[in-house]
């Protein structure tokens, strides 16, 4: 205790260190508090478009995690290096294990200073929650946990790095190492990881995960549905650096001691670091706003992975047990209506690793797998009525973990009969994949939170008949409107009342195709070119409201034709350079042909012709073939006028 008092006295008398602490504490409190006042006085402002504002307030506060890391690394390094040179502490360094005790005392004092500097940020979150009357009761605990992890544990890891650096290298080298750690830990090195994979196919995603000790608010806005990722493996990454730093410091302090002393000092910290390392890099699901390397679907998929094979059987029912923990763990029993087939092709997202495939008696079934495509062979009796699969894994886009879940019914997180394209490389987005006909579902959910679905729920079990079972949780609530269940994020840019107004404005439920369906407002993903809104037999999922009518039309269009729909939607944007666009001769003929058709028929007639083609399932032509053939049938004078850029 005497040593702690002496060490604290030494810290408090150091003007440089105290000035840094006071400036950081006062400025961060004033700036974050001022932003909170701005949000409260402008709550509900359509210009801001941030809805409740709670997540944005938290996001702003967490931006100080990088500043806190740098400030306390500097404070820690200067304190560790100056204290051991202080004449008043020479008596402790001369005693047995004195230097080790001194460093532990310094660490304890610095950790206490970090904690004291964090308390105002926690209080600000509590005050904002109370004054703002935030609609989600559990949010305050989440916000305080984020403050603790990113504004206390992250700077504390910086203090530990500073401790190791003060023993390991001279001042300039130490500061360079600490600066490098801060930059890599902030997430700004993402471009480096992406370049490494694009150029050399070096996957650094696990290295990146180990360095992700700060919130994504440094680069991205928070997800209204998920908030910020606050998972065990991220906390383990922070403790990895703490444990590793202590192991390095312990080794340097006792390197001249006998082996037993060195082992006793280094081994516990080293084992803790290894345990945290393993926990960090093991596969885990999270909500990611940027993914690089082989785990990114944009990098994984190529055009030769796109397959379409109709199944000769139908799934008549599913009995599923889904556990959301570190990742999705699933046990699925799929009843099939054709028991005598030789093989049963199905689609299951490649990120889910299969543990076993059996029949209804538990006998193993032979199977082959190629990415998303799984083929299960019939049992020896040739009469297969049920296929049971056990698998575990995750998607880098559609998360399913102990914090929240987002599994739209259009995504094959459950086995779907036949081979279907999961991800379109042409349009950089996920396709709509559902069952050919509705099946009876029973889904038992094991999760530490409430889950919403288009199926009926009773005691954690969802059941009902559907072609696409959607599962969604997070900062979610629901209400009834015109016989439909509306599921939305309480932190979305629109409030409950504003959602009702917007739905009424566009007469959403006046459309007979949408009337009575459950509506799920869903998170945006990195690849939402094709999944802005999907309409199913009993529900629809959408990232917004105004886009639903257009998306309802778009999803009826086959992928091979969607390019024409994109051009028509943005015709004014593309029209100016139709005739000057670069590309192959076919591309140029396509753009020139579309321009000629618009000039000859007029915009309204062109859209009518194109709409008929887009919705005609029997017409197997691509959009390019359709436009070139139709333009080729125009009078030669009209074609020539179009090529010359002349209107009618």
Predicted regions span which residues?
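Hydrophobic alpha-helical transmembrane segments
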Residues: 1-83, 254-269, 277, 488-494
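Secretory targeting signals
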Residues: 44-68, 78, 104-171
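N-terminal, polar/Ser/Thr-rich
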Residues: 137-138, 193-240, 259-327
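Solvent-exposed beta-hairpin/edge-strand motifs
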Residues: 343-364, 416, 440-452
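A surface-exposed beta-strand-loop module
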Residues: 350-406, 505
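Juxtacatalytic substrate-recognition/specificity segment
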Residues: 477-571, 575-577, 581-582
């Amino acid at each position: 205790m005497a040593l702690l008092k002496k060490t604290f006295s030494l810290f408090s008398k150091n003007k440089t260190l105290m000035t840094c602490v006071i400036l950081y504490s006062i400025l961060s409190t004033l700036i974050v508090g001022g932003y909170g006042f701005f949000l409260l006085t402008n709550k509900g402002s359509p210009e801001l478009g941030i809805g409740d504002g709670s997540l944005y307030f938290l996001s702003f506060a967490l931006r100080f995690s990088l500043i806190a890391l740098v400030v306390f690394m500097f404070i820690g390094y200067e304190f560790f290096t100056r204290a051991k040179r202080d004449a008043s502490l020479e008596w402790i360094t001369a005693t047995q294990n004195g230097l080790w005790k001194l460093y532990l005392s310094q660490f304890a004092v610095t950790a206490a200073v970090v904690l004291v500097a964090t308390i105002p940020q926690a209080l600000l979150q509590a005050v904002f929650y109370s004054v703002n009357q935030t609609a989600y009761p559990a949010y305050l605990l989440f916000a305080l946990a984020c403050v603790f992890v990113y504004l206390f544990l992250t700077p504390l890891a910086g203090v530990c790095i500073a401790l190791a650096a003060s023993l390991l290298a001279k001042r300039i080298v130490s500061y360079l190492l600490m600066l490098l750690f801060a930059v890599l830990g902030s997430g700004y090195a993402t471009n480096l990881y992406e370049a490494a994979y694009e150029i050399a196919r070096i996957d650094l995603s696990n290295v990146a995960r180990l360095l992700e000790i700060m919130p994504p608010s440094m680069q991205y806005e928070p997800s209204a549905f998920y908030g910020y990722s606050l998972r065990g493996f991220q906390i383990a990454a922070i403790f990895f650096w703490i444990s590793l730093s202590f192991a390095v410091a312990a080794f340097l302090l006792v390197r001249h001691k006998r082996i037993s002393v060195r082992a006793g000092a280094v081994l516990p910290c080293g084992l803790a670091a290894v345990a945290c390392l393993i926990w960090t890099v093991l596969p885990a699901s999270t909500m990611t706003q940027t993914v690089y390397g082989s785990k990114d679907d944009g990098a994984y998929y190529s055009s030769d992975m796109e397959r379409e094979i109709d199944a000769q059987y139908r799934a008549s029912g599913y009995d599923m047990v889904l556990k959301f923990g570190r990742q999705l763990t699933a046990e699925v029993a799929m009843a099939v209506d054709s028991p005598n087939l030789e093989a049963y092709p199905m689609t299951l997202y490649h990120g889910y690793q299969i543990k076993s495939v059996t029949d209804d008696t538990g006998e193993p079934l032979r199977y082959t797998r190629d990415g998303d495509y799984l083929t299960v062979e019939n049992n020896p009796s040739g009469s297969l009525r049920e296929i049971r699969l056990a698998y575990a894994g995750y998607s880098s886009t559609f998360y399913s973990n102990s914090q929240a879940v987002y599994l739209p019914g259009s995504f094959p997180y459950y086995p779907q009969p036949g081979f279907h394209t999961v991800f379109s490389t042409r349009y950089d987005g996920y396709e709509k994949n559902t069952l050919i006909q509705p099946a009876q579902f029973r889904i038992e959910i094991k999760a530490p939170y409430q889950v919403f679905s288009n199926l009926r729920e009773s005691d954690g079990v969802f059941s009902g008949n559907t072609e696409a079972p959607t599962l969604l949780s997070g900062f979610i609530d629901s209400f009834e409107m015109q016989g439909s269940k509306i599921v939305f994020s309480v932190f979305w840019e629109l409030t409950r009342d504003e959602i009702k107004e917007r739905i009424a404005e566009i007469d959403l439920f006046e459309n007979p195709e949408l009337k009575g369906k459950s509506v799920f407002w869903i998170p945006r993903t990195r690849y939402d070119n094709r999944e802005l809104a999907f309409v199913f037999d009993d529900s629809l999922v959408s990232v917004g409201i105004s886009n639903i009518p257009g998306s309802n039309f778009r999803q009826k269009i086959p992928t091979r034709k969607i390019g024409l729909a994109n051009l028509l939607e943005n015709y004014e944007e593309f029209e100016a350079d139709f005739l000057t666009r670069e590309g192959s001769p076919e591309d140029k003929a396509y753009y020139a042909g579309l321009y000629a058709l618009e000039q000859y028929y007029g915009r309204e007639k062109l859209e009518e012709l194109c709409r008929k083609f887009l919705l005609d399932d029997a017409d197997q032509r691509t959009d390019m073939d359709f436009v070139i053939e139709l333009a080729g049938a125009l009078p030669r004078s009209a074609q020539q006028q179009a090529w010359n850029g002349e209107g009618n």
